A protein has these predicted regions:
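N-terminal targeting or signal-anchor segments and their processing/structural boundaries
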Residues: 2-646
Length: 646
């Protein structure tokens, strides 16, 4: 009996194994398995049933079920499937074999058209054949709203397509709707920044884009946004388009004329930006022996007031403020204060109320203490001196009497020089502390003439926005060599430190090392700033003058060109502010690469708005590349073409 039972189990296992092998062989011969097992499956899934029916009116059911003729899947449902009106509670989207179900968790609104836009997310499970752009829709009222609004969202600063940002419509035309009410209708941008809002009712709307971090479909400070002051009025008209049917990847089979409804507007461009943080608070304070520094979270025109509680601040400090007063350094002009370990300060500055954003004056008491006390700094200095003296004794034993005085810490100067400069550049000098005195008679600039150096004129000026930076202006001659000599003690710092003797030789590149680019900017005035780009880096920047942007002494290489409208004249691009209704400054790209050659002059005309913004940025500069769309692939025709070619 045990032997019979063993053989029965053995035969049963063998039969199961053979059945599995047979199934595998059959599957290999099944359509969709590849070139060795018959033709590819190129048929997209077909909808066989929708419950409730597509386009139902007066609908009350919150669950939608769609049945197909084959197993299907949804690609990236969280990004591609969009329900409108927006749902506060996330819809539940499920796939099970040949069925897809979507259950809305929010209560249905009366008299409203609902759309579930699947985009190209639905494919079959064998060859990923896409159903195509599919939108399910129904209405809780007596009619369906079918209008559409489409366009692109671009980053305002660099015209990059913004992927995955929400775009919404408000029928409430008040500016406050964006911050207090969820959108009426929504869509989401694809990788090209394109959006299409469906199921829109006739009427007037304001349109917005929103990177909705907190998921409430309303703008919250700090989120990326875009807005338009224009009123959006959806409309439509009958139109004709020509669809191309391909025999394979290179041959056209048929060009088909298709009548369709053309919805407008379909070319909106929203420029997305993040507002500057205008909430001003004191971020931190820092004390070094020779100075103390304060950092703020935002700029302000107000200059903080320092009142010394244990020292005389009126005569003991020198202020070095950044352009927006967001970083301020207070240099200690009195050496007694440098030695004082603790400085107590009543510090009055402009802060911002977090809720109302209104400025007010805040006074804090700051206790400013350096990392190392004066006593410890003196002890470390004494240790360094002892080491030097030991070294001195060793040098004396070797008969070396060249360094008889202890080293004194000099005033440091940094010169931004690469060995050569452009004829249109100047030399920049940076100090490590403010200068108490500069003797320009101890600065010497020489031009090399044959084998000797001849003194030439120059000007030395302190930069407007810092006490530490200076620019030396010279009348540079292309192709010539120069020598800059700065005598010791030419510059004396606030601490009494003096600079060392300084010599540097440099050359000015010749005219034949450069090219020139002259751009005529149609319709542009002096608010337009034009930039030469190497990738993302700005190589040169000029302001338009008399309708032209002229780039002299330009190094030979490939460039791209960007322009922005500098509305406030600060020479840099500025973001927008929704509360003030201020758009970010306009940005444009010249759509082609420009190659500058040595000893060549290039003339180029550019009309800033010749192309829509979404088509301006050269493809080589676009970082946000488009997704690979789920499109029919015609694999069988392609395989036959390869066979014929082989």
């Amino acid at each position: 009996m045990r032997s019979t039972h063993f053989h029965t189990r053995h035969l049963t296992g063998l039969v199961c194994t053979l059945l599995c092998v047979a199934c595998m062989l059959l599957s290999c011969a099944n359509p969709g398995s590849g070139p060795d097992g018959g033709p590819y499956d190129e048929t997209p899934p077909r909808i066989v049933q929708m419950l409730p029916a597509l386009g139902n009116t007066g609908e009350r059911a919150r669950k939608v079920t769609i049945a197909f003729d084959e197993p299907v899947k949804i690609d990236n449902a969280s990004e591609k499937v969009i329900v409108s009106p927006p749902q506060i509670n996330m819809p539940e989207i499920k796939t099970s074999g040949r069925r897809i179900s979507v259950e809305l968790m929010d209560s249905l609104k009366p008299g409203t058209t609902y759309t579930i836009d699947f985009s190209d997310a639905i494919t079959d499970c064998t060859e990923n054949n896409p159903l195509g752009n599919f939108t399910y829709y129904f209405s809780t009222g007596t009619q369906l709203d079918t209008m559409e609004v489409a366009g692109h969202v671009l980053a305002a600063e660099n015209l990059e397509p913004v992927k995955g940002i929400m775009v919404g419509l408000h029928s409430n035309m008040a500016d406050s709707a964006f911050t207090t009410l969820p959108f009426d209708r929504v869509a989401r941008t694809d990788a090209n920044g394109h959006f299409c809002i469906k199921g829109v009712a006739p009427g007037n709307y304001h349109i917005y884009a929103l990177k909705d971090v907190d998921g409430d479909f309303k703008y919250t400070r700090g989120e990326m946004l875009a807005f338009s002051s224009e009123t959006v009025v959806p409309s439509s008209f009958p139109d004709v388009r020509h669809d191309t049917l391909w025999a394979d990847t290179i041959r056209i089979d048929t060009i088909k004329t298709v009548n369709y409804t053309h919805f407008m507007p379909d070319n909106l461009v929203l420029r997305a930006f993040t507002e500057k943080n205008n909430t001003r608070q004191l971020l931190k304070s820092q004390r070094e022996p020779a100075y103390f520094r304060t950092y703020f979270t935002a700029p302000s025109a107000h200059v903080p007031v320092v009142r010394g509680l244990n020292f005389d601040a009126a005569h003991g400090i020198v202020e070095d403020r950044s352009a927006g007063n967001d970083t301020i350094t207070y240099w200690l002009a009195d050496t007694a204060l440098v030695k004082q370990d603790s400085l107590m300060v009543a510090y009055t500055y402009e802060a911002t109320n977090d809720s109302t954003l209104q400025p007010y004056l805040q006074t804090d008491t700051l206790c400013l203490v350096p990392q190392f006390s004066y006593e410890r700094r003196q002890r470390l200095a004494a240790e360094d001196l002892a080491k030097w003296q030991k070294g001195l004794e060793k040098r004396h034993k070797r008969g070396d009497f060249s360094q008889e005085k202890p080293p004194v810490k000099p005033l440091k100067m940094q010169l931004a020089l690469r060995g050569s400069i452009n004829p249109d550049e100047n030399m920049h000098i940076t100090l490590d502390e403010p200068a108490a005195r500069i003797d320009t008679t101890k600065f010497h600039l020489y031009l090399k003439v044959d084998t000797t150096y001849k003194a030439v004129p120059f000007k030395l000026r302190r930069d407007a926005h810092t006490l530490l930076a200076y620019t030396l202006y010279g009348e540079w001659r292309p192709g010539q060599q120069y020598l800059l000599n700065i005598d010791s003690t030419a510059v004396t710092g606030l601490s009494g430190a003096v600079c060392n003797n300084f010599d540097t030789k440099f050359s000015v590149a010749g005219d034949d090392s450069y090219g020139s680019l002259f751009m005529t900017i149609a319709g542009a005035d002096s608010t337009c700033v034009v930039q030469l780009l190497q990738g993302d880096k700005v190589a040169k920047q000029v302001r338009v003058k008399n309708g032209r942007a002229d780039f002299y002494y330009t190094r030979p290489t490939d460039y791209y060109v960007r322009a922005f409208i500098d509305a406030n004249g600060n020479n840099r691009w500025d973001t927008g502010c929704y509360a003030e209704g201020r758009q970010p400054e306009m940005v444009y790209y010249y759509p082609h690469k420009i190659t500058v050659r040595a000893n060549w002059d290039i003339e180029q005309t550019w009309q800033l708005d010749a192309l829509p913004l979404n088509r301006q940025k050269p493809a080589e500069l676009v970082k946000q590349k488009g997704d690979t769309k789920n499109t029919p692939r015609n694999l069988n025709a392609e395989r036959e073409r390869k066979k014929r070619g082989g």
